[in-house]
């Protein structure tokens, strides 16, 4: 009886399992299509003894799976520990160098030879530069004597005396009306950016025309010929002659006041300018330098001596006549 009851229970369980399998087939698809005849063989009735025997196998399988999972976890932990140890080792390998000097123990043979070669190269360069500097010293001394010329010839210096150019043409030869663009006429433009020294467009045009007129009229040859013509006409020496006459007249009046004798000799006249010399100092003769004897002084003194002797003779004659 017990055996029958057990068989009945097993049959019910199998029916329930088959119903569950049908539901899974409907929802997720059948596994028999992939398995084929193997799946059909699994659906056969399993005796109770075999069913009881298979349960421990599943437990063992689960236990094996759990063991595998534990092994994997242990392996992961070991790998993490190894990585941590590697990081610590790499951190410990870092070296902090405080000194700035070169460590000869870490330099190769090529690096050790470079300082000596550099020293030899610098010594050779100094030996080559030394005679050049000695030879260039006199040249520098000569150039220091003429500092003005050196400043004028300085490279890149701005020549303020040179006339500015626009497209290769001096600005004094350019008519602003000819230019296509006149930026100084735009509203808000600053004239000082285009015209210096307070010029405007109108005053600059007047300045250009005046300069052009002066350049055309200026002729040194013409001016010299005009002076020569005035000299030949005697107009350049009139002022000097007139001044000499006035001085001589003033000298005679002065002598008349001093002496009652009207026959007294007059003062020597100043030397007249020779022909061809323009009057200087307003027609007056130039002042003689210290220690310089003015011209015609000897002749004037001779005339004065003879005149004095004559005056003395006439005065003595007059005295005799009175007696």
Curated annotation (Swiss-Prot):
Thylakoid as UniProt keyword: no
Question: What's a Pfam family in this record?
Answer: Fip1
GO BP term, example: mRNA processing
Q: Where in the cell is it found?
A: Nucleus
Coarsely, its chief localization is nucleus
Listed Basic and acidic residues bias regions: 56-65
- UniProt-annotated stretches for the region Disordered: 1-94, 292-323
Keywords attached to this entry: mRNA processing, Nucleus
Q: Which GO MF term does the entry hold, naming one?
A: RNA binding
Q: What segments bear the compositional bias annotation Low complexity?
A: 294-323
Q: Which Gene Ontology cellular-component terms appear in the entry?
A: mRNA cleavage and polyadenylation specificity factor complex
Compositional bias of type Acidic residues: which residue ranges?
A: 19-34, 66-94
Q: Which InterPro entries match?
A: Fip1_dom (IPR007854), Pre-mRNA_3'-end_processing_reg (IPR051187)
So which domain of life are we looking at? Eukaryota
Briefly, what is this protein's role? Pre-mRNA polyadenylation factor that directly interacts with poly(A) polymerase.
The record's similarity note reads:
Belongs to the FIP1 family.
Name-wise, this protein is Pre-mRNA polyadenylation factor FIP1
């Amino acid at each position: 009886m017990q055996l029958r009851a057990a068989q009945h229970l097993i049959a019910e369980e199998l029916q329930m399992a088959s119903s569950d399998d049908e539901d899974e087939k409907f929802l997720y698809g059948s596994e028999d299509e992939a398995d084929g005849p193997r799946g059909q063989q699994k659906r056969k009735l399993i005796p109770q003894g075999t069913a009881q025997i298979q349960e421990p196998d599943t437990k063992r399988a689960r236990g094996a799976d759990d063991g595998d999972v534990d092994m994997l976890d242990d392996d992961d932990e070991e790998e993490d520990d190894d990585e941590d140890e590697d990081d610590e080792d790499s951190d410990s390998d870092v070296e902090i160098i405080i000194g700035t000097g070169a460590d000869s123990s870490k330099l190769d043979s090529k690096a050790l030879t470079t300082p000596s070669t550099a020293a030899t190269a610098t010594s050779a360069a100094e030996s080559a530069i030394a005679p050049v500097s000695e030879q260039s010293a006199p040249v520098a001394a000569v150039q220091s004597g003429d500092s003005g010329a050196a400043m004028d010839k300085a490279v890149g210096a701005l020549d303020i005396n040179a006339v500015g150019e626009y497209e290769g043409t001096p600005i004094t030869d350019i008519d602003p009306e000819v230019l296509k663009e006149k930026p100084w006429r735009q509203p808000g433009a600053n004239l000082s950016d285009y015209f210096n020294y307070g010029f405007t467009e109108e005053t600059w045009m007047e300045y250009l025309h005046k300069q052009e007129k002066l350049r055309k009229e200026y002729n040194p040859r013409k001016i010299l010929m005009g002076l020569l013509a005035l000299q030949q006409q005697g107009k350049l020496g009139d002022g000097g002659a007139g001044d000499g006459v006035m001085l001589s007249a003033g000298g005679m009046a002065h002598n008349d006041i001093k002496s009652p004798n009207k026959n007294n000799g007059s003062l020597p006249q100043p030397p007249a300018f020779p022909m061809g010399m323009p009057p200087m100092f307003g027609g007056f003769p130039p002042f003689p330098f210290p220690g310089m004897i003015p011209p015609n002084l000897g002749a004037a003194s001779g005339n004065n001596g003879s005149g004095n002797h004559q005056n003395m003779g006439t005065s003595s004659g007059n005295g005799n006549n009175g007696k």
